[in-house]
Amino acid sequence: LSGVNFFGLTENDRTFSVAKLFFVYGIGGNLIFPWYVGASCVLYAGPPRQAAAVLKTIETYKPTIFVCVPTVYGAILSLPDFNKRYDIGSLRLCMSAGEPLPSGAWNAWKDASGIEILDTIGCTETYHTFMANRPGEVRPGSSGKPIGGYDVRLVDDEGQDVPTGVIGNLMVRGESTALFYLHQCEKTRHTFRGEWLFT
């Protein structure tokens, strides 16, 4: 229920995600979480990188929460005066995941729209987001802090914790974490290490 508790979803919200429903990012952020609280969602069948179509959808259906990937934010930002040509005033929250969000794109979006983008990390194995920036506490270029119910750590290739400032592999644990991959014993052994998921 990270979407409900962390992002403050209510029955008055309307979500719009360009991520397709066969991705956990799309089905969680644009179907399961909004429906859980009685909110509505905008289902989008168009190509996600067609910025004008995405903006027209926002203008027409007036979502309050926009969920997409950095590539789409970049495509929108490449349209001159998009914020004057399209009404995106219904948005109260924007989220990003799927790839790193460059700090330059975050700053350009904030300058043009007045809205922060909350960069997040999640995966299919945890069902959705396990780390995110908080509203009003965003550090552009960072994916934030663990969401309640999840723990993370950085480890080396042998699974030993690395000191602060050292690059490592991200591990996560939480109640929604999968237990194994069906019929993939070797991949399961590599990825699921006790209660920790080796991302």
Name the predicted role of every residue range.
Residues 1-17, 22-64, 79:
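Conserved AMP-binding/adenylation subdomain of ANL enzymes
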Residues 11-12, 91, 114, 194:
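Phosphate-coordination loops involved in phosphoryl transfer and adenosine-cofactor binding
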Residues 17, 43, 68, 96, ...:
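A structural signal for the hydrophobic beta-strands that form the central parallel beta-sheet
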Residues 145-149, 197:
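Short coil-to-beta-strand transition motifs
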Residues 160-165, 171-199:
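Conserved ATP-binding/catalytic segment of the ANL
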